[in-house]
Design a protein with these regions (language model features):
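Hydrophobic core
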Residues: 12-17
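Carboxylate- and glycine-rich phosphate/diphosphate-binding segment that chelates Mg2+/Mn2+
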Residues: 182-184
């Protein structure tokens, strides 16, 4: 894990060379993150004091969905974003207003980063595997999110059309989880 923290630290140090706010030789930076395991290297670096040891004063700003992190990075609300490759991120990077400087996580075969969940009622009615998502109401954070993209990959893999799924964008992970628990959707990608 320390290696990932070093990667995050290296990115911050590269950014420091470009003219960042300094106070008493401490570099200040705001990092936009989600409350997900994919941001764990940043959480560990913060909790273990790795940033502080390197002369960095890091403030974490939490977001409810990935796409707003890319927007906040380009607007200057945060200095860095730890986020998924969303449609919005690709758009901003394609316009040259956002740069990808490193990657922190990747899926390993058999260990997906995204969970596929069925509501209790949908499960009891037969929603047992991703191939059963066709015809169901499926919560994602946002249209164009990494969860939306993953749903498209599931459709390709299991032989149904994405248009066969009623996509329900709920703007945050907590809203998607609440909809799943409240049975207002059949499934959610979280």
């Amino acid at each position: 894990m320390k290696g990932w923290a070093r990667l995050a630290l290296a990115g911050l140090l590269m950014w420091a060379a470009s003219g960042i706010a300094r106070a008493d030789d401490v570099l200040k930076a705001k990092i936009g993150v989600l409350r997900l395991s994919s941001s764990a290297p940043v959480f560990i670096a913060q909790d273990k004091g790795y940033f502080r040891e390197a002369g960095l004063d890091v403030e974490l700003k939490f977001f409810d969905a990935a796409q707003p992190i890319a927007v906040a990075t380009t607007s200057g609300d945060v200095d860095f974003g730890v986020t998924a490759f969303t449609a919005g991120l690709y758009n901003l990077a394609g316009k040259g207003v956002l740069k990808v400087i490193g990657g922190m996580s990747r899926e390993k075969a058999g260990y997906p980063l995204i969970g596929y969940f069925a509501s209790n009622n949908a499960y009891a009615a037969g929603l047992k595997t991703p191939k059963d998502l066709a015809g169901k109401r499926v919560a994602v954070t946002q249209v164009g999110s990494s969860f939306h993209y993953s749903l498209g990959l599931l459709a390709d893999k299991y032989g149904f059309k994405l248009s066969d799924v009623k996509i329900v964008p709920l703007q945050s992970l907590s809203n998607a989880a609440a909809a799943l628990k409240g049975e207002t959707v059949d499934a959610a990608l979280l």
